[in-house]
Curated annotation (Swiss-Prot):
Binds 2 Mg(2+) ion per subunit. The active site is at D7, E69, D141. Belongs to the RuvC family. This is Crossover junction endodeoxyribonuclease RuvC. The gene is ruvC. It is found in: Cytoplasm. NCBIfam families: ruvC. The RuvA-RuvB-RuvC complex processes Holliday junction (HJ) DNA during genetic recombination and DNA repair. Endonuclease that resolves HJ intermediates. Cleaves cruciform DNA by making single-stranded nicks across the HJ at symmetrical positions within the homologous arms, yielding a 5'-phosphate and a 3'-hydroxyl group; requires a central core of homology in the junction. The consensus cleavage sequence is 5'-(A/T)TT(C/G)-3'. Cleavage occurs on the 3'-side of the TT dinucleotide at the point of strand exchange. InterPro entries: RNaseH-like_sf, RNaseH_sf, X-over_junc_endoDNase_Mg_BS, X-over_junc_endoDNase_RuvC. Its cofactor is Mg(2+).
Amino acid sequence: MHILGIDPGLQITGFGVVDMDGPHLRYVASGTIKTTHLDTKDLPGRLKVLFDGVREVVQRYQPEVASVEIVFVNVNPQATLLLGQARGACITALVSSDLAVAEYTALQMKKAVAGYGKAGKAEVQQMVMRLLKLPSLPGKDAADALGLAITHAHVGTAMARLALASEAGGKMDGNYRAGRSR
């Protein structure tokens, strides 16, 4: 299953694609979508670049699901609003491509990838490189996006299995119910 991670940003949006085959993860691609070539006052133009860029990534790599970082209020409310609009353009591109979208906080991603929620950017980059056996460090934005894809591979698929078990009356693969083996 191909999982697309998106780290939204108005100037630079990171993307990362991993393939999950059972418990194994394999790097597929990563990169950035940049709007820095546009005038900072051209917000609609920047949002269109993000929308089109995310759609292009989806068409190229054909993911089955996407994982996007949740944005929280920063010290600067204007920056938070702009980031929220960038995030909205990315999510709109994903859902218009008929993708399910999972959302995770930066803390959840850092905890899933590095083992604790206060990990710095460099630690996330190092762990992404190790987990995906990359030959070199990915860029910060791409590393965060890959981290979001990894987070969904670990957390999201486990949550989906629990939901399916709940719908099936608490049974998981017919071997377990309420935590006890039968």
